[in-house]
């Protein structure tokens, strides 16, 4: 019923002039997402580009100035489960927490307080069982939270939307809190200028060539 009641959702969403706080240290960013697989998030500080996380129809990538060695890691989508990519650097996960994807192919659902909990059973990149839960706010008719639990039912990472923009009768994220429990890392997204169904520049989906590239398949540090 939730999916049928939703307004017609956009094929793309973009945010400009965002502030990203990582353990209270802030950077600026722009985020663009065009279904099904085009994604780009570039974060900058006064020292220049800090992170570049992206995806196109064929491959995904991430680069961080703070990682040593500072490679641009990439792989094809079909090999995602064969890589050691951690959740916070996974464009697929970031697309999900923006809240404009259809909710489908889930294993079960139930109501929890004012939320509809949608449950997915999956395996991570190490072939360990994980459980993904999305909480849908039935009053606002939109995504509230996204949670991943390990095989011991311990919460690994969560993303909760605490404030929304109302655009074209649809609630989209304005503020997202991400808690990566494994690394004791808290990230806050304060999302700025939002646009739905905007024609996004195709150059956004091109992997940058100005960094040394390493395929995640077979890579070990």
Kindly give the residue locations of the regions a language model identified:
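Gly/Pro-enriched, hydrophobic low-complexity segments
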Residues: 110-214
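N-terminal leader/targeting segments and the immediate start of mature chains
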Residues: 1-24, 88, 212-221
